[in-house]
């Protein structure tokens, strides 16, 4: 006997399962089955496709007039951090740039101070609350970065919290060491601090899957980033890079040359960098919510990347300074409006391609897959990015069991 049947599905979203990320025109190819059925046994997908009455189960969910998709994949977050920075909103309104705020001791450095002061338990409780909000909005696979410690003790503290959250919720979660996220005030020099973070790599290997670095004006150069990435790769890390967020330094080109699993931000990436995506499986993780929150007008050139047969994913960049949202659905709407992505492209970018960007087995509903599914209170897949700012996730199903039922919460 099967455990669960989801029947009468108005639209069943079935992203392609591929070894590599979807690139170029492939991103717009999305299998949508009308009047679909999903069957689950022992936490795994038994069947997903056209309507079928051939199966029996102990529980049946009627998804009439609903959309069913894989659970969303959140490919870029700064989940574990102390404090908040709401006071910076007025500075941004006055036109003060992010780098200027950073130079004044704000930005990342103010979060570093708050994170260092916070106990591990305080960080855990804060991160747990934000993680649960992500899950309520349909996310069941998450990448979580450190980067607000900037020293051994506090970077490890953040990574321990991230690992504890994954264990508590048995969650598909990847952990990223972002030690070189900024240069602390007490550093002798950028180069000395970078070497300190390189020396820390062997110790964080037990807690982190990826090594990441912020390659940007005033932080780390392309040459410094290359040194760090190659040291991390030599220890067995997959590497990522925050690149070309503000200036076109060549971070995207470096990511491709170093075979990084992803390059993130890419607002200012060069034409040459975008052209290099054609022959690379490095995923361009675009963060339009950050551009929106910072009030900037220039967004990452998603269409140009796709025209060059690049692979892109969409994520929130949830953090306390430049994108204070853990609602990936909202960022899907921003991606439609500002990145000019189609609904099909967006769905692939937050499921299968996001999973490739963090090397995790998620984002599809195929026979044998984990039954991590969302039932959406929406008439079709286009409606979710269209009706922005609210939570359309009605039921979040993890390993074949209803983990979150937002409809029950509303009725209560």
Curated annotation (Swiss-Prot):
Binding site for Zn(2+): 76, 78, 242, 317
Keyword terms of this UniProt record: Cytoplasm, Histidine metabolism, Hydrolase, Iron, Metal-binding, Zinc
Protein location: Cytoplasm
Encoding gene (name): hutI
EC code(s) of this entry: 3.5.2.7
Function: Catalyzes the hydrolytic cleavage of the carbon-nitrogen bond in imidazolone-5-propanoate to yield N-formimidoyl-L-glutamate. It is the third step in the universal histidine degradation pathway.
Listed name of the protein: Imidazolonepropionase
Location (main, coarse): cytoplasm
GO molecular function: imidazolonepropionase activity; iron ion binding; zinc ion binding
Catalysed reactions, semicolon-separated: 4-imidazolone-5-propanoate + H2O = N-formimidoyl-L-glutamate
UniProt record, GO biological process: L-histidine catabolic process to glutamate and formamide; L-histidine catabolic process to glutamate and formate
